[in-house]
Structures are given as C-alpha cells and as structure tokens.
UniProtKB/Swiss-Prot annotation:
Entry protein name: Nuclear cap-binding protein subunit 2
Lineage: Eukaryota, Metazoa, Chordata, Craniata, Vertebrata
The organism of origin for this protein: Xenopus laevis
Binding site for mRNA: 17, 40, 109-113, 120-124, 130-131
Cross-referenced Pfam families: RRM_1
Keyword Secreted recorded: no
Amino acid sequence: MALSALRSDSYVDLSQYRDQHFRGNRSDQESLLKQSCTLYVGNLSFYTTEEQIHELFSKSGDVKRIVMGLDKVKKTACGFCFVEYYTRADAEQAMRFINGTRLDDRIVRTDWDAGFKEGRQYGRGKSGGQVRDEYRQDYDAGRGGYGKVVQSF
C-alpha cells in the first residue's frame, strides 16, 4: 500500500468532477479522460487573452489549440478555456506545474477534459456566463465587477 502512494501523482490523477453533459456512460468518459490530451482551464479573468494562455501553457509542451470559453449571448470571454496538447505527456506536465499558478491575479485551475466538442465553449449559466458568477456577491474586477444577480437589484 505504501508503494502505491509513492507511485501516485495527485496532480495528474483524475478529479471527482465529471461533465454532466457528456454523451456516453461513465466508463466511456473515464477512459477518454485517462488518455486525453485536453485540459479544462478555469477561474480565468474575463480579460485573460488567448495569447496569455498560449504563453503560459506552451511552457509545458507544444499546444495544439486553445478554445476560449464564451458567454453564449454576448460572445465575450467568461472565465474558462480548453487547452489541447499534441501529447498526453505535455498535458500531464501542465497539470503538474500550471494548476494553482497565478495569471491576471487569479489562481488558475486545471482539470482533465474528455476532449473538446463544438458548442462546449459557451458558458452554461442562465445568462451565458458561468453559474457561480451569477450568484457571486463580492466585487471581482477580473470577473467583470459584481455578480449578475447582485447587479439586478
């Protein structure tokens, strides 16, 4: 048991999160996640650019493509993106070394993604942004100010 803990790489292990909109069963999703070269990147500032993402993530390997998350109504950035690498090894490097780093005064959060599909770049909240931003009551300049619910009062 102690030896298995030594081989564990918690930065690369799959998290408990699973995409609720994944089309397929849980074992299919797990299998795709274990071989994926695509990362979900969250907690980004609404003002973080694709160029900044590329500059940071290319330090871990060759980036194949970046898909910025967009507000489905306004088509503006809404705090997440997908980063796809050519190899799993490069994606694992990013999971180890970029998760938890700071970009635009925000702590970047990375997780495995089963692979980008068209349409997933749009935020899932009611107004097209991220759900948690709609209910946020504090002021966050990197997220466009106050949450949308607070702004409506």
